[in-house]
Regions:
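C-terminal helical cap(s) of enzyme catalytic domains, especially alpha/beta-barrels
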Residues: 94-110, 268-282, 337-355
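A gly/proline- and charged-residue-enriched helix-loop-helix capping module
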Residues: 88-134
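Active-site glycine- and acidic-residue-rich loops that bind
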Residues: 163-175, 202-203, 209, 231-252
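Glycine-rich phosphate-binding active-site loops on the catalytic face of alpha/beta enzymes
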Residues: 83-95, 193-195, 257-265, 315-316, ...
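Catalytic cores of alpha/beta
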Residues: 70-79, 238-252, 302, 306, ...
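Arg/Gly-rich low-complexity intrinsically disordered repeat tracts
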Residues: 132-152
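Glycine/Thr-rich beta-alpha phosphate-binding loop at enzyme active sites
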Residues: 26-29, 33-43, 195-206, 249-306, ...
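Short beta-strand/loop segments at the ligand-binding rim of alpha/beta enzyme cores
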Residues: 54-63, 153-158, 223-238, 300-312
Length: 355
């Protein structure tokens, strides 16, 4: 059924379809009986639960950052069965992102190219939206995990970045602003220094730049009544030496986890849509990233001896794909491009196939 729907949706621009589909789902889920019907059809079985960072997840399948940038569709995504959703990337100030078109499908390769450019409503508006979500879903400020009390059990991650106009030497200030504003409303943080769509951002993956940003956030975190896990999202295009530097730093400062990986600027994995892939700049995601992502997950796990939890992201479409990541050492997995190609039942199908 979804293949038929997808063939129609793919006739229209990718970004337009994204918002159209989610807004239709939001309208449907505004009716409680329809939301419950959707949840009963798409949520995986209760025996998929998993605990990590003192958080209890309904399952190990999450939605990666960039899908719900502005925390507008949390109820709808929970109804589709996601165990956790990573909002953002959130920046201190609102920004429009790069010029459209900026999202491209490569259907023969089951891939996407995006050069969105951290388009988001800004941290103030998003924090207020999360506050309203918390109030409406029975979450309380004294909770260790404010998003898992009473009505909702959805775990929310906050993916944070810097504004395009902020020079790299001041980037730590942008991460601090976002961290403080969102701290009360998210369950964990992901520091994003690996997007290829903000000029110069990946330079912040260098060891000393990273140390400055993350250690500063850890100091703020330690002063809070309840500390939140801080993770780092890394690029798949790092050299072995760069990756070793990141891992060594993560071990040294006791980072709570790594997200492996972001999108790639490499186009070698394309087999069919090479013309589109080379014409359009931006980050490539989906099946072409699958092998490299798994290699990095395995390398991190072996080098850290499993001491640092890993969220795997890249080319996950099926239960077999997820199992490959778990076997490589991942604790959790995130889908994004797979969600577009496989449809709303992806979480339930993956969880079922993992049994």
């Amino acid at each position: 059924m979804y293949k038929i729907v997808r063939s129609v949706l793919f006739l229209f621009p990718a970004e337009w379809v994204h918002y159209f589909s989610m807004n239709v789902l939001r309208i449907l889920c505004s009716l409680d009986f329809i939301r419950k019907f959707i949840a009963s059809g798409f949520s995986p079985r209760s025996d998929s639960e998993f605990g990590i960072w003192r958080l209890e997840l309904t399952n190990r399948i999450g939605l990666g950052a960039g899908f719900d940038k502005n925390a507008k569709y949390l109820r709808e995504l929970e109804a589709l069965g996601f165990g956790f959703v990573e909002i953002g990337t959130v920046t201190p100030l609102p920004q429009a992102g790069n010029d459209k078109p900026r999202l491209f499908r490569l259907p023969k390769d089951k891939a996407l190219i995006n050069r969105m450019g951290f388009n988001n409503d800004g941290v103030k508006i998003i924090a207020e939206r999360l506050r309203q979500w918390a109030m409406g879903n029975g979450q309380y400020p004294t909770s260790n995990s404010p998003v898992t009390i009473h009505h909702s059990r959805l775990i929310i991650g906050g993916n944070i970045g810097k504004n395009k106009v902020t020079p790299n030497e001041d980037a730590w200030k942008d991460y601090e602003i976002c961290f403080k504003e969102l701290h009360h409303y998210v369950d964990y943080f992901v520091v994003n220094v690996s997007s290829p769509n903000t000029p110069g951002l990946r330079e912040l993956q260098e060891k000393e730049s990273l140390r400055k940003i993350v250690r500063h956030l850890q100091m703020i975190n330690n002063g809070k009544a309840v500390a939140k896990p801080i993770l780092l999202k890394i690029a798949p295009d790092l050299t072995k030496e760069q990756l070793d530097d990141v891992i060594d730093l993560a071990m040294e400062i006791k980072l709570d986890g790594l997200v492996a990986t972001n999108t790639t600027i490499d186009r070698d994995g394309l087999n069919h849509d090479f013309k589109i892939g080379t014409r359009e700049t931006g980050g490539l995601s989906g099946k072409p990233l699958q092998k490299r992502s798994t290699e990095i997950v395995k390398y991190i796990f072996e080098k850290t001896k499993g001491e640092i939890p890993i969220i795997a992201s890249g080319g996950i479409f099926t239960g077999a794909d997820a199992k490959e990541k778990f076997d490589a050492g991942a604790s959790l997995v995130q889908v994004w491009t797979g969600f577009i190609y496989e449809g709303p039942a992806i979480v339930k199908k993956i969880c079922k196939n993992l049994k």
